Structure formats: C-alpha cells, structure tokens
Amino acid sequence: MSAFVVAYFPHLCLAFGGLLVLCLSMARSVPAGFYPATAALFAALPGLWAVAGPQGGSPIACFYAGLLSVIALATIALLARYAERRGFAGDALYGLLLWSALGMLLLADADDWIMLAVGLELASLCLYALIAARLDDNLGTEAALKYFLPGAMALAVLLFGMALIYAASGSMEIAASLAAPGPLTAAGLALVLVGVGFKLSLAPVHLWTPDVYQGAPAPVAAFLSSGSKAAAAAALLHVCSEVSPEARELLWPALAVGAGLTMAVGNLGAVAQASVKRLLAYSSIAQMGYILMAAMAVNDGGGEAALFYLAAFALMDLAAFGAVGALSAQIGDRDDIAAYRGLGYVHPWRAGVLAIGLASLAGLPPTAGFVGKFLVFGAALSAGYVGLAAFGIITAVVGVFYALRLLAALYMRESLIAHPAAVYAAGPAGTLALGVMAAGLVGLGLFPQTLLGAIAALFGGA
C-alpha cells in the first residue's frame, strides 16, 4: 500500500463513502445509505487512530480524529429514524454528513492555511444543505440562510487574515508563518481568530447561533454543535499553540475579554430562553468561552484540559440534542419548555438522557462537564489568568439555573400533565447512541483518568 493511501486512508474512506452514498441516492428510490455510511466510518476508525494526520499530525489532530468518528456515528444513528418519520429521509443526508465530517477532519489535520480554509468550507457547505434538508420547513430554510450569509462574511475575514500573514511571513505553513513577529502578522492573526470565532460562536460573532439551532432538525443541530465546533476548536488550539510571544502580548488581552464575554452571554442568554433548542444553543456558546480560556493556556498545560473538555462537550451536546429529537413528536421538534412538563415520568429513559446532558452542560457532578470545568479553571489559574478564571466560575454558577429550570419541568408532578406526550420511536441505533452518550458522560465524570491518561500519552508522544 502506497504511503499516500496510508496517510490519507481515513480521508479516503469518508470521501468515497460519501460518493457511494450519493450515487445510491440516484440509483435507488428507497433510502439505503445508513449502512454504507456507517460502514465507511467504521472502516476509517482504525486509520483515524493510526494516522495522526497527513503531515505526521499533532496530538490534537490525532485525538480529534477519534472524537470525530464518535460524533459522526452518533449523528447517523440519531438521524436515521428521525428523518424517516418526518418524511425527509434520503441517502443524500448521509453522503453530505460524511463529506462534512471529511471537511472537519481536514480542518483538524491542517498544518497550512489553505487546508484550514478548505476543510472549514467543505464542512460548512454540507451543513448548509443538512440544515435545510426538509424542504417544506420554512424555519429550516431560514436557518440555513442565517448560517450561510454571515458565514460567507466570516470566510472573507478569515481569508484576508491569512493573506496578511502570508504577506508578512512568505509561508503558508501555520507554524512557520506565525513564528514571524510583526504588526502585520498580529493583524492577520486577529482576523483569522475572528473567522474561527464565528464558527465557534464566540461573542460578539455569536448572534446566528440560536436561530440556526432552533430551525435545524435536532440531530443536525447536534452535529453542527458538536462536530463543527470541535473541528474549529481543534484549529484554534493548533493556532494558539504556534503564536509567538510578541503576538500573545498584543492579542491575549482581547481574547480574555472575548472569553469572558462569551461565557457571560451564553449563560445569561440561556437563563432567559423559553425555547429548549435556543437554551441549548446559548449553552453551547458558553462552553466555547471555556474552551477559549483553555486555548489561551495551551502552552501552559491547558492543552490537555481543553481536549478533555472538548470530548465532554461533544458528548453532552449530542446527548442533549439527541434527547430533544427523541422526545419530539412526528410533526416537529418539541421546543417549548412548557411542553416538557412531566416527561420524566412519561418517558423516563429519554428524559434521563436529557437530564444527564443538562447536568453536564451546567457542570454538575458526577458528570464529565464538572471534571472538564475543573480542569479548565485549574489550567487558567496555573497560567496566571486568575481574574478570568474567577469570572468563569461565576458564570458557571449562573449557568446552573437554566439546567435546573428545564430539569424542574421534566420532573414536575405527573398529576399536572393533562395528556401523555406522544413521541416517535428512536429506533435501536438511536437508542444505543443515546445510551452510549449518557454512559460516557457519567463514566468520564466518575473515572476521568481513563481519558486523561490517553490524552497525556498523546502529548508525551508529541
């Protein structure tokens, strides 16, 4: 087997798997893409761990490659029965999902600016179509446009920043170009961080997030929140690890303000929401503020904390959005908090998964979210960001209220429910995915060293 095939084996599995599924969508009238899409991801899984990346890879890229497979597999499992019951099932969904996952993998693997931009846009273009997958749903079409239009502007800002960095350094490699000090490099890096910050929903470029998450189908919102943000976070961590000390002195104060603003906007915004999907959207914004705080300390021990929190975030968002989809009726997603009253008694298994996801998002023990926040705050304190860490702890306490609000609705007295809420069957694959997510959140909360040891080994081999 050639070196090219070995190096790019995971990418080839996703690329040809997506192509095969799209060809099936044209050749068959009955959707059958679930099985080849799942097979493509399982085929790529050994290579994702064996190959850290096309250029030798980094610990971040190697870790993210494994995480991506879990995110994509869980999304396919959650999407299968959901799309079928809502009348928009088709093989094209799975093909687009595989190609979007390919873009995310390229983004995480990127060692040069061109690959970073290509991966970012490949993932985004497929997500635009997935968000608007149900053509008779005006809310989904509107959400896709609200993601596409500001996304195009963010790409322009990102590319302009890359052009400035290239003009200052003469190199398209991320590490080499950021090593060149100077105001032009710092200006370009600032624009790049704004572009990546849009994908991460960092304040103040976060305004698209609640509308898009509310309009997207719940499993697609789960993939958008966990996969897209994990890919962008991997790129952010890589870039931050290569920034010169001179550029840090110029830009890190602005990043600290952005992290604090993101944590505050996300948690306070979630408290004020009556829509469950908008609540989860604001919660995901807040989580990215914690990731940004860890990214600032990536060279001071924050890298391991960031990767643990990234894995926990992916699991908690998949669990929460997946449970929302599983608790929804055939017509549309159950989105009003009032509609969740007493579902903990009517549908205890699905409500329990949502409760675990919410508890982890709020950082309550014994979940992975609690351990992740503890590690992130510890890394920030060790790096000297005492004020930012203290502010983050305050916002995390505020964030507990939105979780308790929805949890209180879920477990309101059964006697107050006038009519049992009908939901669709999640199917064996969806049920298994929800169970794995919930077990993972509790397992990592009780035994965090299992994942922390693997992450430490990756950094030790860097």
Swiss-Prot record:
Instruction: Tell me its family.
Output: Belongs to the complex I subunit 2 family.
Membrane-crossing ranges are 4-24, 32-52, 60-80, 88-108, 113-133, 148-168, 178-198, 220-240, 251-271, 279-299, 307-327, 351-371, 374-394, 416-436, 439-459
Q: What is said about its interaction partners and assembly?
A: NDH-1 is composed of 14 different subunits. Subunits NuoA, H, J, K, L, M, N constitute the membrane sector of the complex.
What is the purpose of this protein?
Answer: NDH-1 shuttles electrons from NADH, via FMN and iron-sulfur (Fe-S) centers, to quinones in the respiratory chain. The immediate electron acceptor for the enzyme in this species is believed to be ubiquinone. Couples the redox reaction to proton translocation (for every two electrons transferred, four hydrogen ions are translocated across the cytoplasmic membrane), and thus conserves the redox energy in a proton gradient.
**Record's GO cellular component terms:** plasma membrane
What are the leading ranks of the lineage? Answer: Bacteria, Pseudomonadati, Thermodesulfobacteriota, Desulfovibrionia, Desulfovibrionales
The membrane topology of this protein is:
Multi-pass membrane protein
Catalytic activity, per the record? a quinone + NADH + 5 H(+)(in) = a quinol + NAD(+) + 4 H(+)(out)
> Organism, per UniProt?
Solidesulfovibrio magneticus (strain ATCC 700980 / DSM 13731 / RS-1)
Q: Which domain of life is it from?
A: Bacteria
EC numbers for this chain: 7.1.1.-
Subcellular location field: Cell inner membrane
Q: Which top-level enzyme class is recorded in the Swiss-Prot or TrEMBL entry?
A: translocase
Annotated PANTHER family: NADH DEHYDROGENASE
The identity of this protein, by name, is NADH-quinone oxidoreductase subunit N 1
